Amino acid sequence: MTATPAQRRPALPATRPYPARHGPKGSYLRKMVTTTDPKDLGVLYLVSATGFFLIGGLLALLMRGELARPGLQFLSAEQYNQLFTMHGTIMLLFYATPVVFGFANAVLPLQIGAPDVAFPRLNAFSYWLYLFGATMATAGFLTPGGAADFGWTAYTPLSLSEHSPGVGADLWILGLAVSGLGTILGAVNMITTVVCLRAPGMTMFRMPIFTWNILITSILVLLAFPILTAALMALAYDRHLGGHIYDPANGGAILYQHLFWFFGHPEVYIIALPFFGIISEVIPVFSRKPIFGYTALVYATLAIAALSMAVWAHHMYATGAVLLPFFSMMTFLIAVPTGVKFFNWIGTMWKGQITFETPMLFAIGFIVTFLLGGLSGVILASPPLDWHVTDSYFVVAHFHYVLFGTIVFATFAGIYFWFPKLTGRFMDERLGRLHFWTTFLGFHLTFLVQHWLGNEGMPRRYADYLPSDGFTGLNTVSTIGSFLLGISMVTFVWNGFKSFRYGEVVTVDDPWGAGNSLEWATTCPPPRHNFYELPRIRSERPAFELHYPHMAERMRAEAHAGRRAGHGAGAELSVPSTVATKDDDHTS
């Protein structure tokens, strides 16, 4: 593998100190509140999700502060329960899921050459449902009894009215139902947009990998989220109308766990697959190569989605009420298509002319972290090993490596990657590198040691421990790492604010110089309906062909897929050069 140092582009003058204001003061706010433009809604999703991410991170810092030393107890046990309940809920359902739709709204219509999404007003309605539901659930902290305190899984009978009588629990249930409805409607919109609004020439196997992953994720949303909504409505019915749905005689706790995890495990892939797609967009651009194994990546994504519906009960090994061999085998099997993706990402970088701009740094951080999380997942997939570490900090470390490693690293890769496209300005590269290294080091310092804590027997969800337990040293290290992680977010927020106002102005359609998909064939930022003119779409790399038409024949000859000339997605590249270069003088 060869690597070349990142070449700093010549500084461009900031021709304006701040994006020009059109209309009277306050008109921008009014525009964002009433908008149906998917790019604006994407920004709203991303900003709102980042806000909830900061709230969830603050809750995590309070928990880590509590656990830094034994006997501190600046939080009561009840407050600690509320913190870990809302931390998990916010991070998974109010940050990770909506940030998927933020990227989907901002980028997917551009990538398929569509002027808008299929249902613009429904799209806006979906966002406001999410924001209203998330605010409702989080508002439990303002009630006299505090927020929900039964864990983000809300297992019965703990979540029934006898054990959790507060208003905060009801707000949590209804907030998740409302927010989940917004997610379902957003998925319907994305599926319809991909099926109905692709540009001429944009066949399914010419779509970018990110678009494929959003399509498959949206199908998973339609399969999983209605189950969560039904389970929550049944829980509300039990709490207030005496439904007895979760009584032991009718299935009880095991029935609820099956319903919840039939949603819960597909949810893990609902919030993972889109970020796999982001990484699949970032790596080729900064490796200066086409994606290795495009078709294999698509089929691997389909395989992961299918298998994700068949592994939910591996969360229930400890109950003894599930068929262990089947669910263990399915869990091991899901590692195969995931391994295919790793093979393709590494194959894309192999012998590439790699440059290490901030998006690429976060993409590599994603690969390293997610790989380590997957290795601990192999341990947990085996029931005999899982029984020894279940409900310990080993499990906490595993799912943070998998989820943080996937969602947060890929989120930042996507933001740094598409920020110039959406705003017309670059983010600060030095602050970006500082952000990456503080995030990477802070994360691994926080969660690597938690594997050892779990192996030594520290249970999760405990608000305190004894000095004689021997957990003090590793907990102190973990807390130091968590505060370093918190500092990294200050860097990111300042970078985003500073770059939006004063960042280096983008003057070209493709600021990274090697963009493949259609969003790099329009202006930065794009016009209201995305394109002034669409280039011809002959393969899965239309923007690259537009900007480098003289490379068409070589790209066909060196295609990884080894298609025969005249067949497959790259066949049109063999047309006479007079046709292939017809759009040479095209400008977007």
From Swiss-Prot:
What positions does the entry give for heme a3 binding? H398
- Example GO biological process term? electron transport coupled proton transport
Membrane topology category: Multi-pass membrane protein
Where along the chain is Cu cation bound? Answer: H265, Y269, H314, H315
Residues engaged in binding Fe(II)-heme a? H87, H400
Could you tell me the EC number(s) of this protein?
Answer: 7.1.1.9
Which residue windows are coiled coil? none
Q: Which GO terms describe its molecular function?
A: cytochrome-c oxidase activity; heme binding; metal ion binding
- What general EC class does the enzyme of this chain belong to? translocase
Query: Entry's PANTHER family?
Result: CYTOCHROME C OXIDASE SUBUNIT 1 (PTHR10422:SF18)
Complexes and interactors: Associates with subunits II, III and IV to form cytochrome c oxidase.
Q: What is this protein called?
A: Probable cytochrome c oxidase subunit 1-beta
Which species does the entry assign this protein to? Nocardia farcinica (strain IFM 10152)
Q: Which gene encodes it?
A: ctaD2
